[in-house]
Each structure stands twice: as C-alpha cells, then as structure tokens.
C-alpha cells in the first residue's frame, strides 16, 4: 500500500435483545430487518455495511467488524474501532464483553489475540515492538487508567500534525496474557455508576491504543500502525436515567462530548464546510485521524429495539447513516531509508526543474500578452502537458524535505536547531504543565479528602451536638420530673405529717374519749349495780305484786263474777298498745334504711343487666357480620375459581387460534409455492399473466384479511385476558380487604368477649357485695331483735314500777312523798342512761371515722412509696444512659481519629509505592514465536519456535527509564 487510497467509514449496526426491565414494562420490539444490510424503524429504512440481529454471537460480531483491520494495522496502516449508542445499548459488551468467559469475549480481547496469532504466522525476518496505552476521558479530562496520578493529560500534535496524548503511560507487551492483565488493571480504575437504565453504566469514554512497530532486519524497512479501540459512554436522557448529583455532572459532560462528535461527523458528511470543529472536545481531537484522516475506521452503532427508546434509536441510526458517508485517506506509515529519501529527492528535484521551465514559458507568454502581441494557439503553453502531475505517494513530509534540501546548508542547520529547540521548549513546558496539573490534582484530592474529613467531622459534631442536646433535654426533663416528684414527695410528706398530726390528735382525742368512756363505763357499772339492786328490789316488789295481783285477781274474779266488769283489762291493753307502737317505730326506721339500699342495688343491677343485654346484641350483630363476611369470601373464592377457568378457556382459545394461524401460514406457504409454479409457467403463457396476477392479489388480500382477523382476535383475547386479570386483581383486593375486615371484627369480638368477662367478674363482685349486705342485714336484724328485747325488758320494768307505785298509792297515802322521790330518782336515772348511750354512739362513730382515715392513709402510702422508687430508678437510668452516651461518643471519636490516621498512612504508602516504578524494557517479539514462551525468552525466539543460535537480540531493545513516553 505505497499509494494512498480512499475508503468510507465502515458502519455496522448491532441490535441487542430486549432486557428484563423493558419486558416487564411492556415495551415492544419495533425494529425490522428487510435485508442483511438494512434496518427499518417506523417505516424508514437505513442501510449500513452490515446489520447484526440480536441473536448473533460475539465471535460473529468480531469476524464481521474487526478482524479485517488486523492485517491493515500489521501492514503499517492506522485503524480505529469504536462503539456508539445510547446508554444501556450494549457498547461495553460489544467492545469488552465478559473477560472471564472466552465465548463472551468482545472485540478488544479477541483482536489482541488475533494480532499475536497474525504476528506468529508472518515472516521471521520481521521484528515487532508493541506498546499499549489505556486512558479515559472523564469530565472532559484525559485520565490515565494505568497511572491514576495522571488526571489531566494534554493532547499535542507531532511534526506531521497528528494528535497524540502527551504523557500517557505506555506498556511494552509480548503476549496476549500481558495485554489482558493491563486491560484488567485499567478496567478496575474506570469510572462506572448505577442508573435507572443500567447497573454498570460507563461514565467516561475509554481509549485503548495499540501501537505496533515492525522492522525488517534484512531490508531495514520500518512500518508502524496504531489501533484505537474506543468504548464511548452512552448518550443519556436524564428523565430516564434518573441522574442526580455527580452522576448528573458526568451525564452533562458525556452528552457535550458526544454532541461535539456529532458536529464533526456532520461537518465531514456535508463536504462543503471548510472548517471541521475537531477542537471542540478532547474526544474529537484524539479521533481526528480516525474521522476523515489517515485511518481505516469501523463504527459499531448499538441500538435498543424497545419502543420505550424509539427516539434514541432513530437518532443513533441517523448518526450512523451520516458517518457512513465520511471518506478517510488510508496510507502506509513508513519510515523511509536513506536511498528511498535520495530517490524521492531526485524525483522532486527533476519535477521542480520542469516546473521552473514551465514557469519561464508562462512568464514569456504573459509578457507577450502584456505588450499587446497576439500569441497563437500553437505557441500557447499547454499546462496539462508541461506541468508534471504530482505523485499520489508524495506526501507533505517529502515535499517539505525537498524544500529544506533546496536551502543552503547553514539555513537548514539553523532551522533544524530552532525546530529542535522549540520542540525542547514545548516538551519542557508540557512537562511543567503536566507536573503542575498533577500537583494541582494531588492538592485537589488532598483538599477533597480534607473537606470530606471536615464534613464528616462536622456531621459527627452535629450528630454529637444533637445527641448532647437530646440528652440534655432528656436530662432537663428528668430533672423536671425529679423536681415534680420531689415536690410531690414534699407535699406527700407534708400531708403525711399533717395526717400524722391529725392521727396523733385523733389518738389523743380517742384516748381522752376512751378515758371519758372508761369513766362513763365505770359510772355505767355503778349505775348497773344500782340497776341490779333496783332489779332485785323490783323482783322482790314483783313477787309481792304478784302475790298481791293473785290475791287481787282472785278478788277481781270474785268481783267480776259478781259485777261482770272489764276494768281490770284496761291497762294491759294500753300497755300492749304502747309496745306495738314502739316496735313499729323501730321496724319502720330499719325498713326505710334498708329500702334505700335495696333501691340503689336494684338500679345498679338493672344497669348491669341492660349493659349485658347490649353486649349480647353487639356480639350477635358481629357474629352476623362475621358470617356474612365468610359468605362473601366464599363467593369471591368461587368467582376467582370461575375466572381462573375462564382464563384457562381463553388460553385454550389462544392456542387454538395460534394453531389456526400456523395452519394458515402453511396454506400460505403452499399457495406461495403454487404461485411460484404459476410464475414459472407464465414465461410460456403470457396470456395468463393478468389472471395469475389477479389470483395473486386475491390471495394476498385474503392472507392480509386473515392476518388482520388473527391480529384482531389476538388483540381481543389479550384485552379479555387483561380484563380478567384486572378482575382477578380486584377480587384479590376485595378478598384481602374482607380478610382485614374479618380480622378487625374478630378483634372486636374478642374485645367484647373480654369486656363481657370483665363485666361478669364485676357482676360477681356486686353479687358478693349484695350477699355481704344481706349477711350484714341479717346481723343487724339480730342486733335489732336483741335491742327490742332489751327495750321490752325496760318497758316491763317501767310497767312494774308504775304498778308498784299505784299499789303503794292505794295502800298508803302517807307514803306519797317517798314514792314521789323514788319516781324522781328513776326519771333522773333514765335521763342519765340516755345521755350515756348518746355519748357512746358518738364515740363509736368517731372511732370508726378514725379507723377509716387510718386505713386510707395506709393504702395511699405504698402507692406513693412505689412512685418514689420508680422516679428514683428513672433518674438512675437517665444518669447511666448519659454516662454511656458520653463514653460511646469518646470511643467513636477515638475510633474515627484512628481510622483517619490509618487512611492517611495508607494513602501515603500508596503514593510512595506509585513513585517507586521500576524501569521498563521493551520486548520485541518475532513471528513464528510460540505463545507459551515466557517473556524472558521472547527476544531471542525466531520462526518455528526454535532459539536463535546467536543468542537474544538485545541491541534493538530500547531501555525506558520511566513509564511515560514522549513524542
């Protein structure tokens, strides 16, 4: 390929299958493939060099798109392969694939293996030097993936105005395994992120450069070829990817650089524009030779077939269609020998001599025209014959060499020195800029780390402040609680002191009353003794009265028999009337008292019975609702079963329709075969052409009608299935809602049952209280009977006293004064007894009240003591929690400081390790070398796998003292 040749950019369209997310979302496959090199979307057809369907293998993609470039690169030409498309369209899968599975390898690992296999089959007199570089364009900055300290590399141009990345790390390799190790190393340093459309979305454009230099050891002919393998980041629509924060900034830069790439391709495809905006982004600067320059370029446009991404897919196809019109001029990159330069110099010198002679003729002809002379056609200079045609192989470099050779030796030496000096100054300035940028990046990283540490410290400090404020608030609230508890305790103590004082006062009063009671009791005893004496005397009088009454009755009987009067029955009748009145009064008081208590108990019992009836009614209603809910659930389950059967019937119908479609397709195939047979016969019978075409149109219309009916039936079945599914979902929702209602009703039922149990317990307690009241009533009744008996005894004594006094009045009038004195003494004794009874009753009431107050205080005292203990425990727990929080904060602070120190030490050690790169030695490899030979023996292996008899050829191996390479 000594002569430059034009060629278009080769564009291959690859369509990936629908992914799981698109299938779940219901996206449809909208792309169609009319032929192997065309694709259509929404009725518009795009033609490319090759269209790859979703089911093609990685090996087929490589064989179609990348394998032909290997021979061109090893023949001294430049090559470029890059993937373009929206995010999640399969670009990284196409370029890299799955490195762990050989069957899923992408273009990069396969082309690396193929390059070495091609080298092993070439002439053994050829010696190769292979260098690789791997960098990414992240946030419009070139970042070295093999040395992450180089974060802002610059793009320069060499003497032939070819752009290159200055300062990028170059690794010399001699086997595919070494290349794969470098790829793994760079891939681990590449920026990736998670978006809504892709779990491993590339956030940068990666460029993998393979620089192959070869030299024929016999003819000293040197060729060089560069292979750019570019994995572009996908264009993103933020509304779909959900990018935010740093990911959003990355998306902006990605879309900006891809927009610049689109502008370059549009300008190159137009052909009329004089300016191509290569300098709008670093991506287009690096790909300048690949787009409209000296390179054989293959572009793989990756498309998504989903209807969800229809607009992005159209944009990608239009991009590929424009890129297909770009023409590159491919020429061999050859370093000429001295003889070749000399031959070209002589050729150019001869050409310049002819040009000078032609110029002299033209000047003479022009002079004649200016003087007004006419120049005949035969005498006019023919430029087509006289001007020698420029050789297509003549490059601007050779022309410049010829012009420099035409200068004198001094000017040429001075120009060469100035050029070298300028290049040296440019290199020094680039080194200085690179060092400054690296220093700036390091300082930025340190500042970012410090800012992160400060932000983390601020967040920790804010969290600690919040914890401290929360703990202080808890402490304040605890203090308030303690104060309230202490105040309550003080009030309780004061109340307790007051109650104690009151109890002491009451006890003193009780003691005083007890003393008074004792005195009253002693007085009562004395009175009782006197009463006993009176009883004895009354008994004595009673006997006497009895005797006298017997005698009197006898006398009265005798008198009654004689007279027949009722005077003797008057007093007993009056006495019995007084007794009945007193007993009625006592019974009436007791009955009125018990009546009020019984009324209250009856009303309380009625309320409880009403509440119980209401509860029973609620339970019955809830049981009815529960049974209704169970019935509804059974009905819905039956409906669900019927709907499932309907769905199964729909599926069967769908299968039957699919079988019908298959049968129709078979009939269509048969009809098509018959049609072909008819077409074969048409060549012999031209008269039947119209009839056959009409038959064909009728058949096509019938097939179209069948297809439309089938589509309608399928659509109706899908709609019916979706409706059934919606109905099933609604029934499931209703079932779940009814289940929740059932659970709620069951909970309410359990709650009512619990309330019923509690009320039954309360009713039992009330019944027990009623029984106790009945028992107390019986006891009180017995007491009343005893009191009634005592009153009856006193009444009898009073009657006896009255009778005795009457008898004494009758017997002796002389003893009237004495009887009057006795009657006055008895009245005084009765008054004294009633006074003592009243005092005793008051003392009993006071004693009972004191006992009740003491019992209430004793009941309140344990509650207050329990509350005091709970408050003290709460205070102790808050104090321990505060202490634990302080200790935890101290531990977290120490651990955080230790972690920061450890990270700083690790970063420092890592920086030291990065600075300690050892010197690299380029390892030339020879064709015929076996793949399994170790790199240490690679320099001495020749064709056939045998070792060279002259030992390893180290003379051609350049020694590099640093990992960077300069242009």
From Swiss-Prot:
Main location: cytoplasm
Gene Ontology BP annotations: microtubule-based movement
Cellular localisation: Cytoplasm, Cytoskeleton; Cell projection, Axon
Region of interest (Microtubule-binding), ranges: 173-314
Keywords: ATP-binding, Cell projection, Coiled coil, Cytoplasm, Cytoskeleton, Microtubule, Motor protein, Nucleotide-binding
InterPro entries: Kinesin-like_fam, Kinesin_motor_CS, Kinesin_motor_dom, Kinesin_motor_dom_sf, P-loop_NTPase
GO molecular function: ATP binding; microtubule binding; microtubule motor activity
PANTHER family named among the record's database cross-references: CENTROMERE PROTEIN E (PTHR47968), KINESIN HEAVY CHAIN ISOFORM X1 (PTHR47968:SF36)
Family to which the UniProt record says this protein belongs: Belongs to the TRAFAC class myosin-kinesin ATPase superfamily. Kinesin family. Kinesin subfamily.
Function: Kinesin is a microtubule-associated force-producing protein that may play a role in organelle transport.
Protein name (Swiss-Prot/TrEMBL): Kinesin heavy chain
Species in which this protein is naturally found: Doryteuthis pealeii
